[in-house]
UniProtKB/Swiss-Prot annotation:
GO terms for cellular component: cytosolic small ribosomal subunit. This is Small ribosomal subunit protein uS3. Keywords: Ribonucleoprotein, Ribosomal protein, RNA-binding, rRNA-binding. It comes from Xanthomonas campestris pv. campestris (strain ATCC 33913 / DSM 3586 / NCPPB 528 / LMG 568 / P 25). The lineage of its organism: Bacteria, Pseudomonadati, Pseudomonadota, Gammaproteobacteria, Lysobacterales. Binds the lower part of the 30S subunit head. Binds mRNA in the 70S ribosome, positioning it for translation. NCBIfam families: rpsC_bact.
Length: 244
């Protein structure tokens, strides 16, 4: 099942959190969801050059709080905060409530799957060889601490008449492990030959809850091991032999 479902959707509540956090009645739920989708679409179009990783939306007490995770916060904020103020007014009109916009910087964009996918898409649009773009992104992610990464590109690669898909992986990407922290991103490259889809999976480690972390700490408590015996530990003492 790990290869059939969305890597983020199957891990919600286990290793991943929701991008929208609010409660609504049945009558308002559809309107809230539609507004969230429109706001995200508008922000991604206007901030296409800002390297948007994800957009979190919260609705506390008849207000809206939008958190934009970006690799280039200066592009979002603008000179003296003029651009972000325009965005705030537009978001308030779309959502119908006062809105606040927070900007969070992505420290390592090479470890963000969405940003990696968009970077590969931009390279393909500049007619860079897809294998070179894939290997460069994989190498940067592994160098900065990723435990595994997989990149899949599909379409008319290098202008071939027949579309195909190719993938490159380094490290391990356990899609069947629900507690695995796997970041997933998707982007499309519009080339002269057609659209090329890029999918990226980045494995960053495992997520444990507090009870499991406590158990691990107990299991990892130091034992009375001897240096010359490695990990075998102390052996039970034998009774001394009687002298003849």
């Amino acid at each position: 099942m790990g290869h059939k479902v969305h890597p983020t959707g199957i891990r919600l509540g286990i290793a991943k959190d929701w991008n929208s956090k609010w409660y609504a009645s049945k009558a308002d739920f559809a309107a809230y969801l539609a507004a969230d989708l429109k706001v995200r679409e508008m922000l991604r179009k206007k901030l296409a050059q800002a390297g948007i990783s994800k957009i979190l939306i919260e609705r506390p007490a008849k207000t809206a709080r939008v958190t934009i995770h970006t690799a280039r916060p200066g592009v979002v904020i603008g000179k003296r905060g003029e651009d972000i103020e325009k965005l705030r007014k537009e978001v308030s009109e779309m959502m119908g409530v006062p809105a606040h916009i927070n900007v969070t910087e992505v420290r390592k964009p090479e470890l963000d799957a969405q940003l990696v996918a968009e970077s590969i898409a931009q390279q393909l649009e500049r007619r860079i060889m897809f294998r070179r773009a894939m290997k460069r992104s994989v190498g940067n992610a592994m160098r900065l601490g990723a435990l595994g990464i997989k990149v899949n590109v599909a379409g008319r690669l290098n202008g071939a008449e027949i579309a195909r898909s190719e993938w490159y992986r380094e490290g391990r990407v356990p899609l069947h492990t629900l507690r695995a922290d796997i970041d997933y991103g998707f982007a499309e490259a519009s080339t002269t030959y057609g659209i090329i889809g890029i999918k990226v999976w980045i494995y960053k480690g495992e997520v444990f809850d507090f009870s499991q972390v406590g158990q691990e700490k107990q299991d990892d408590s130091p034992r009375n091991d001897r240096n010359d015996r490695g990990d075998r530990g102390d052996r039970p003492s034998r009774p001394a032999r009687e002298a003849r």
